Structures are given as C-alpha cells and as structure tokens.
Regions:
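Structural signal for interior beta-strand "rungs" in well-ordered beta-sheet cores
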Residues: 1-81
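Terminal amphipathic alpha-helical/low-complexity segments used for targeting or macromolecular assembly
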Residues: 79, 86-95
C-alpha cells in the first residue's frame, strides 16, 4: 500500500492486494478509497483514482479508473456493476 494513499473508514484489504502510485499519464498519483470498501485478494488499485463508498472489489480485479458509490467491480479490466448493498455481509459496521 503506497503511503500516499488515502483510505476511509471500515475498509477491508485482503492478502496480496497492491494499492499503488502511477508515475505518469493522466492518472498520475495515488488512489483515494472511500468508506465501507472491501478489496479482494490479489486485486490491483492504481493511479489517482477515487473508489467510492460501499464498494466491493472482487478478487483479482484490476482498477485504474474511478468507481462510483454502491458498486461491485470485477475482472481485468475491471467491470462495474451497480448494486445498492454491495458490501452487505462483507463488512460489519457497529453503530
């Protein structure tokens, strides 16, 4: 995980995840990750992108683009599926 990455609350990051900096191009920089995000094993999140709130990134996904709130992202290249309860049963919040 690049130390310049901004990570929100209730974020789960599993084994083998790379959250990195892109050193050139339009997306030069590090990711910003919202609240209530679940990032699956061996996923890659790279560049000055924004991952919204309530997002599930499936294992092995490659993300180098902005992801809106309430989404599931899977595959390489990543494909976005809109889902209101994306992280339900993956992230427990205590209120």
């Amino acid at each position: 995980i690049n130390p310049k990455t901004k990570i929100g609350e209730n974020v789960t990051i599993l084994n083998g995840v790379l959250i990195g900096q892109q050193n050139r191009g339009r997306k030069q920089g590090c990711p910003t990750i919202g609240n209530k995000v679940w990032i699956g094993t061996n996923s890659i999140v790279v560049g000055a992108i924004h991952i919204g709130n309530n997002v599930l990134i499936a294992p092995g996904a490659y993300i180098n683009f902005d992801v809106p709130d309430n989404s599931i992202v899977l595959g390489n290249p990543g494909t976005i599926i809109s889902k209101q309860d994306a992280t339900d049963s993956y992230i427990t919040t205590y209120e």
